[in-house]
Amino acid sequence: MIPFSVRVPASTANVGPGFDSVGIALSLYLDVVVKEKADKWQVIHSFEESIPADDKNLIVSTACKVCPSISPHIIEVTSNIPLTRGLGSSASAIVAGIELANQLGNLNLTADQKVQIATNFEGHPDNVAASILGGTVIGALDGKDVSVVRIESKELGVVSLIPNEELNTDESRSVLPKMFPFHEAVKASAISNVLVAALCQKRWEVVGEMMERDHFHEPYRLELVPLLPSIRKCAKEFGAYGTALSGAGPSIFILAPYEKRQEIAGQLARVFTDMKVCELEIDHKGIIVNKEEHIGS
């Protein structure tokens, strides 16, 4: 087999009230170069030592669950997606593993099938669907049924503020209530409905307003990310549409006019000097497989 590579974009989830449903692919990437067969799986990477370099690696273990018959290979993994920062690092690894199985096992999976499999692993479709399809996605998992709609948002730019501290998703979910009053659920879902409608109609000011009015999760996570209100205030003053937690946090996700993203990022970097401020774009391609002969040569 000709060596091939897989590129998977990062993602942000929720966009405020679109909890476990709305996702956006971002221009940070996990790259996997698949090299020669081997007696056992070898994962070449320069991440921290806690990231496995064998068949326990999330990419490899996912691939082997999808297609147990695939032969071990040497793979090289690089990524500029920060780990445990709310930017879909684990989702991108799961998606890469599914594509690894798809290619090595000649499964010929459709995009919809990849989304279904990835959602089964992840438990919700927002991050994985965005990484597979690119762009902005709205998804729902109902039992075993996954439904996803993709929309374009090319007029939008993204700024992300990434703190030095990690925040495990399980820890961030632990602060959420186990029960939600009916009247609060009605209010929260109505706001989410307007967010989705505004995304579809490209009414960006309304998108920004709705993404800052979440009731599902952000009020409970403020204790873990206390800078969110001040970042939100500054971003709005600098011309952003809206600000929200990126996934479970701790990163902050800002939607802005595409042409203003650099200026807004620069202004925020001067205020929040203890955080890494990234000017990003929405990735519209999703997962990419490259089978050109020069890969790995």
From Swiss-Prot:
It comes from the Bacteria. Pathway: Amino-acid biosynthesis; L-threonine biosynthesis; L-threonine from L-aspartate: step 4/5. Keywords: Amino-acid biosynthesis, ATP-binding, Cytoplasm, Kinase, Nucleotide-binding, Threonine biosynthesis, Transferase. ATP binds at P82, L83, T84, R85, G86, L87, G88, S89, S90, A91, S92. It holds the Pfam family GHMP_kinases_C. The keyword Cytoplasm applies. SUPFAM superfamilies: GHMP Kinase, C-terminal domain, Ribosomal protein S5 domain 2-like. It catalyses: L-homoserine + ATP = O-phospho-L-homoserine + ADP + H(+). It is found in: Cytoplasm. GO terms for molecular function: ATP binding; homoserine kinase activity. The keyword ATP-binding applies. PROSITE patterns: GHMP_KINASES_ATP. GO terms for cellular component: cytoplasm. Its EC number is 2.7.1.39. GO terms for biological process: threonine biosynthetic process. NCBIfam families: thrB. Catalyzes the ATP-dependent phosphorylation of L-homoserine to L-homoserine phosphate. Belongs to the GHMP kinase family. Homoserine kinase subfamily. This is Homoserine kinase. It comes from Bacillus cereus (strain B4264).
